[in-house]
Amino acid sequence: MKIRKAEKKDIPRILALLGQVLQIHAEIRPDIFIPGTTKYTPCELAELLEQEDHPIYVAVDEDDLCMGYAFCQLREQPFSTNMVPFKSLFIDDLCVDKQTRGQHIGESLFEYVKQQAKELGCYEVTLNVWAGNTSAEHFYEKMGMKTKERQM
């Protein structure tokens, strides 16, 4: 397995994985998520691949098939009267194909994102988890993440 930046050839597999994530969210929150859809269209995903401040990393197998991804956003907090300026790398979405879970691909992707954040001069890596997504909560806690804010 290797991890690299996503390319246009990865779009079909990324869309399939986005569908897996959306299904989980639709089961947790059927009042707002629509099963059988994805967060992005192929065109939107192609545009996203061009944005330097929205890197998408993919874990690929020996045949260069995408087994998982991490959608990220580089965020900058400018100086204000109450906060020092800093950069963070926000994980907008992380998924490993349900057929390849349990092979430490998610851990590898997460560690890769942390390394990229360090190389980009980021102060921290952040993310959101939907309430009820206990497997994601446990995964991120295992990776050392701690809750620092709750939205209600």
Question: PLM features: residue spans?
Answer:
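A short beta-loop-alpha structural element at the N-terminal edge
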Residues: 2-17
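Conserved GNAT-fold acetyl-CoA-binding loop/helix
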Residues: 23-45
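A short helix-loop-beta-strand connector motif used in the catalytic cores of GNAT acetyltransferases and
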Residues: 43-58
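Conserved beta-strand in the GNAT
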Residues: 58, 65-74, 95
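Glycine-rich acyl-CoA binding loop
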Residues: 59, 102-110, 117
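A short, internal acetyl-CoA/4′-phosphopantetheine-binding micro-motif in the GNAT/acyltransferase core
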Residues: 60, 76, 92-101
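Conserved active-site alpha-helix within GNAT-family acetyltransferase domains
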Residues: 107, 111, 119, 131-149
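Conserved GNAT acetyl-CoA-binding A-motif
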Residues: 118-128
